[in-house]
Amino acid sequence: MALWGGRFQGETSALFKLFNDSLPVDYRLFEQDVVGSIAWADAIASVGIITATECSDLKQALNELLVEVQGDPAIILASGAEDIHSFVESALIAKVGDLGKKLHTGRSRNDQVATDLKLWCQSEGKALLARLQGLHAELLALAEREFDAVMPGYTHLQRAQPVTFGHWCLAYVEMTERDISRLADALTRANTCPLGSGALAGTAYKMDRHALATALNFASPTLNSLDSVSDRDHVVELCSTASISMMHLSRMAEDLIFFNSGEANFISLSDEVTSGSSLMPQKKNPDALELIRGKTGRVYGSLVGILTTMKALPLAYNKDMQEDKEGLFDVVDSWAICLDMAVLVLSGLKVNRPNALLAAQQGYANSTELADYLVSKGMPFREAHHVVGEVVVAAIAKQIPLEDFSLAELKTFAAIIEEDVYPNLTIEACLAKRDVLGGTALPQIQQAIAAKKAR
């Protein structure tokens, strides 16, 4: 039975019903709808709309329904109800008769769905926080295990300066920490209860909305009924936070795809997260990482979708807002599986230390060290930069690394170069000189890991 039939004399078009019904999407709010309805039963009992006995009967029936649906979730979609609110109310009336018709007194589907959705976001958000913390822990463990594995660092996808794999891991630890903070902030802002706002002007019954918020584990009630029923900032923020986190996951995936490639071969991925080719027997494809990278686009799409849906809506509720859930649910599902998959990828990752070290020793990644050496001898950096560029051109022509030039050859570029230049050109020296907060020197990496583990 529709919740709004009295105003209408004609039959609803079957096509319109298919177009209008949201149960195939919002069935996921079932538990939140029941929990909110239990709290609402207490609220209307507190102002005398129902008796204590009626309240107890309603709550018992709602809890029975909760158990029944948990045992057979297919009941919901088989009902043919318009939405999850209609399903719960119809099932309640089937259990307790006309008493079930009293539950919606003073309540609108507008504040009801806003409450359901915030409850769902709080629950799923906390689960996502746990997943982010799991990723953080896995990255930190990998950083500790491979803190001294030397590899090339890149700019413009060209070898730039040597770093360590531990330093690379710590970069994503920092990103993940920001994601954790961002999600926690979003959940704090969303921790307000819209229930009691009615359709748009507030409920007509003078109930204690602070008590109602407390009953539903919200920090406080919302303060403006118009805003309460039309606010979807929590959906936007959750999608935005997911998009930023997915961007970080996608960048990490791209790095690892390259590191795993035959052209780099710095790492190997476990068989658990790779697949083969139907034609080429030798292939071992990084499909888990590619799917993380690919799913990032659909998460972005949902963020743009909800922003576009909301951008021109007048206050208060509009049916457009029914479109808030499908994208949100997909965002949360995609983000969750990508976080789980990232942990699985990292847990089985092996670093090919010889190949990574060899790559770091090539590509003239020690050029900056030669420039710094010239600066230490009194040459202005800009001049030193130019001189070293000339040395690199000559080295490329001879197909040798910088350290293979004889001292006499180096002096043709700068007479101030002495024998003590050679220790400065080693990989070890390149790393050791970056002994500053945030740098790639091994002591800095160890200190950073220890500091993060101590939190």
From Swiss-Prot:
GO terms for molecular function: argininosuccinate lyase activity. It catalyses: 2-(N(omega)-L-arginino)succinate = fumarate + L-arginine. Keywords: Amino-acid biosynthesis, Arginine biosynthesis, Cytoplasm, Lyase. It comes from the Bacteria. Its main location: cytoplasm. InterPro entries: Arg_succ_lyase_C (IPR029419), Argininosuccinate_lyase (IPR009049), Fumarase/histidase_N (IPR024083), Fumarate_lyase_CS (IPR020557), Fumarate_lyase_fam (IPR000362), Fumarate_lyase_N (IPR022761), L-Aspartase-like (IPR008948). PROSITE patterns: FUMARATE_LYASES. GO terms for biological process: arginine biosynthetic process via ornithine; L-arginine biosynthetic process. NCBIfam families: argH, PRK12308.1. This is Argininosuccinate lyase. It comes from Shewanella putrefaciens (strain CN-32 / ATCC BAA-453). The gene is argH.
